[in-house]
Amino acid sequence: MKIAFVGASGYGNVGDDTYPLVFQEQFRGAELLFFNSDLPAEMPSDLDLVVLGGGGIIYNSATHDESPSPHFRCMQFYMDHAIASGTPWGFLSCGLQLRARRDEYFRTDLAPWVPYLQQADFITVRSPECVQKIQDITGRKDGVSFFPDAAYLYRTHAPAPPAGGRPMLTVVPAGVINPHNQHNQHMVRLARSLDYEVVWMSMGAPVDDGTHLDNAQLLDPTVRIIRRPGPAAAYAQIGASRLVFTGRYHGMIFARAQGIPFYVSEDAPYKIRMEDLQADPADAQGHVETLKAAMERVQSGAKK
């Protein structure tokens, strides 16, 4: 079976680069192709399924004239291809990516997505709030399910960083978790007073995190910096930590998956704030089961 996954991997964001690894592990018997917003000249003509996800790809940062955003138009390319070719398609382990301080405008911001969300064969999302909002704007009552993010299924055998005998605080910058935030500085000072080693680690693209890491190094030349760890190294670093401060969604996921205490700010992005921290991370397997059911439907149709 040939499946095209459309996400945001390949740009250096550790969380987005984790999804292909999870899907490759879970669907070893299938031929998997991965695409993102660098659109191909054409899509393969022999696809059996088109999957949008994982990640927070359901968003529309509208322009000043309220026209669909470039991101939406890129995703539209793939959805239109699936519809025109009659290829079954849907969303897997996705999230709504609402703009800061615009939560109440989600109906307007997500309007271009509505006809596509209504037509998708399956939709799995990573928070109960996402389910409610999709049902609100589409009117559909079935085919939309919540499971914890698929990245909870990620495992690696990468060696842990060498232990220096001191507890370790790992800081994953984004948003207010940054070197110049006064509250963050205060928390780091408290950790140092308890003899914690402080490590700053990027989990975003270099264009997003480079300045934060440079500033952390300027403020404290002795601090350890991890610039481009990749999923395996990031997972191992977080697993070796006593505590994690993170502004990145997958910094929280990697910590929670390994039972590492973590802190996120009250002003965290929508996807972090909406995470159901009571849900069992093992329930992320629901995304896999949903896609397996879609694959079985395709195979049954082919047999007929």
Spell out what each predicted region is.
Residues M1-K304:
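Active-site anion-handling motifs in enzyme catalytic cores
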